[in-house]
């Protein structure tokens, strides 16, 4: 397969989207031009283009990310370096958080230990960073996080 990105609206108005044009019980249904907010669509298209361009020029994600730290007070991540990456960033977040709340630039290395960050309390990942600062997606340790 190929890496892919899906850009979507999560708060859809189902009377105006995914409907055949009709009036039912006094409600007008359907995708019609009067419901399009062109200023918003233009801003969203510009934002999407910038984000996708940044993703396209970013280096590939690190490969073979591994984690160690069971029954230790610190957590160590290791990975294979990627051609085109100038450095790497280690990310972690509480297991209840949907976003990467913490990260640390770790340089052009292939492993890093987060001192006094216990493996049991967080999710961890690593991203590759290009010379210009563009960054790959974060990769979780283990086979499930691999793009290979």
Where are these regions (language model features)?
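Secretory-pathway/membrane protein signature
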Residues: 1-148
């Amino acid at each position: 397969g190929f890496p892919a990105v899906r850009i979507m609206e999560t708060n859809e108005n189902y009377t105006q989207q995914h409907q055949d044009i009709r009036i039912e019980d006094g409600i007008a249904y359907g995708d019609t031009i009067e419901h399009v907010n062109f200023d918003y669509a233009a801003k969203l298209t510009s934002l999407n283009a910038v984000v996708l361009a940044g993703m396209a020029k970013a280096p590939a994600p690190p490969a073979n990310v591994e984690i160690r730290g069971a029954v230790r007070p610190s957590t160590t991540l290791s990975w294979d370096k990627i051609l085109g990456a100038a450095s790497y960033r280690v990310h972690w977040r509480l297991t209840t958080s949907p976003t990467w709340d913490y990260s640390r630039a770790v340089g052009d290395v292939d492993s890093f230990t987060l001192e006094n960050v216990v493996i049991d309390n967080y999710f961890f990942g690593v991203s590759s960073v290009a010379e210009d600062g563009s960054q790959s997606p974060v990769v979780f340790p283990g086979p499930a996080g691999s793009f290979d």
